[in-house]
């Protein structure tokens, strides 16, 4: 399975992406999430995801 990281500052959208999509159907699993660009960068280094889904404009860092 491909590892997915969700990086989105709006909690409602982040939760929607995580729980409304059937990730296993597309051979993926959500391994982490982040609410800021800086958190996302830290998670990328720690989790080494295959796919990062991110917002374009984020607090701290785009």
Task: Report residues per predicted region.
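Non-catalytic signal-transmission and effector/linker regions of two-component phosphorelay proteins
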Residues: 1-3
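Conserved acidic carboxylate
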Residues: 8
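Two-component/phosphorelay signaling modules centered on CheY-like receiver
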Residues: 11-32
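Helix N-cap/capping motif at the beta->alpha junctions
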Residues: 33-42
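Active-site residues of response regulator receiver
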Residues: 55
């Amino acid at each position: 399975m491909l590892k997915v990281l969700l990086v989105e500052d709006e909690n409602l959208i982040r939760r929607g992406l995580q729980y409304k999509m059937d990730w296993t159907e597309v051979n993926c699993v959500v391994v982490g999430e982040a609410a800021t660009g800086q958190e996302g960068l830290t998670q990328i280094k720690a989790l080494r995801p295959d796919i990062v889904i991110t917002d374009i404009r984020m607090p701290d860092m785009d």
